[in-house]
Amino acid sequence: MTVKLVRMWSGEDVIADIVEDTSDSIIITDPIVAVPSPQQGNIAFAPWSPLLQKDKIEITKKYVVYIGDPQEEIIEQYKSMFGKISTPTKKLIL
């Protein structure tokens, strides 16, 4: 999982897993944006483009200002939201 912050020309900071990075575009999955929380000083996360049906979104790089690493706390929160939970294939006998 490659969690990055993507700053769009529109001013949005999108946090997503970048699954492919080419010279012309990036392909992301599970994109979210930070939104103000009712509690002062806190933020919450909301889906970016929640009406899309696709699992992967291709973004042309001409609409991207920069791509960077989010703060470690943001990465951990993202991974807890979208990380795959692996379960053992065999049952343990206790």
Please name every model-derived segment.
Residues 1-94:
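Conserved RNA-binding domains used in RNP assembly and mRNA/RNA metabolism
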